[in-house]
Regions:
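Conserved ABC transporter NBD signature motif
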Residues: 61-69
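Catalytic Walker B motif of ABC-type/P-loop ATPase nucleotide-binding domains
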Residues: 166-169
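Conserved ABC ATPase signature
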Residues: 141-145, 149
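ABC nucleotide-binding domain "signature" region
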Residues: 120-132
């Protein structure tokens, strides 16, 4: 479970261009929910997602993940917790174009502290690619894929470590409506397997397929 209490995020702190992106955001995300974070451009959606995913730190407030306070953790502990519990899907896919699908999805396992033989790692990679319908392309380089296929690979990489918490930043933003529908079906299946899924989106059709919506405007949660 995720608990956010009065989260404040300030960019360029102490400088002339100081900017407070989040103004006391409080929210609770229960295990197994599929949630959309919506709002206008610049409202603070991605900032909040980056805080949830340990990509960015907050300046005030409290973030508790599965009973563990995040704020006082050092970078090493945060990296370990992120690798074990959180899967992150970035807006630009963040895949290595010249790598094969298999080698891209393998990366989180190579950084994991879980002791696994190479065969077990490869089995996990194949299972993750199969879950998103990309197993048959595992030896193909990413640069040969369409946008929708790349998104599927990004999802496979995010779930290969078996995280309980999946975060996605505008995962359908560059996709057509048909591909968006296919990707949302993948997220739905992942959620039905018991994972918590949080999707930042500006697409109402995506938000409508989630169980709950958190709306952010001007750095605050609005009802």
């Amino acid at each position: 479970m995720v608990q956010l209490k009065d989260i404040v995020k300030i960019y360029n702190k102490g400088k002339s261009n100081e900017f407070e992106a989040l103004h006391g955001v409080s929210a609770e995300i229960k295990d197994g929910e599929m949630i959309a974070i919506v709002g206008t451009s610049g409202a603070g959606k991605s900032t909040l997602l980056h805080i949830l995913g340990f990509i960015d730190r907050y300046d005030k407030g409290e973030y508790i993940l599965d009973g563990t306070p995040v704020g006082k953790m050092n970078e090493i502990k945060m990296a370990h917790l992120r690798n074990e519990k959180i899967g992150m899907i970035m807006q630009d896919f963040a895949l290595i174009e010249d790598y094969t699908l298999r080698d891209n999805v393998l990366i989180p396992l190579d950084f994991s502290k879980k002791k696994m033989r190479k065969k077990e790692k490869l089995n996990r990679v194949i299972s993750a690619l199969e879950a998103v319908g990309m197993k048959e392309h595992c030896h193909k380089p990413v640069k040969q894929l369409s946008g929708g296929q790349k998104q599927r690979v990004a999802i496979a990489r995010a779930i290969v470590n078996d995280p309980s918490f999946l975060l996605a930043d505008e995962p359908t933003g560059a996709l057509d409506s048909k591909t968006t529908d296919e990707i949302m079906k993948v997220f739905k299946r992942i959620n039905e397997e018991g994972r918590t899924v949080v999707i930042v989106t500006h697409d109402n059709s995506v938000a409508e397929r989630c169980s709950r919506v958190i709306r952010i405007e001007d750095g605050m949660v609005v009802k």
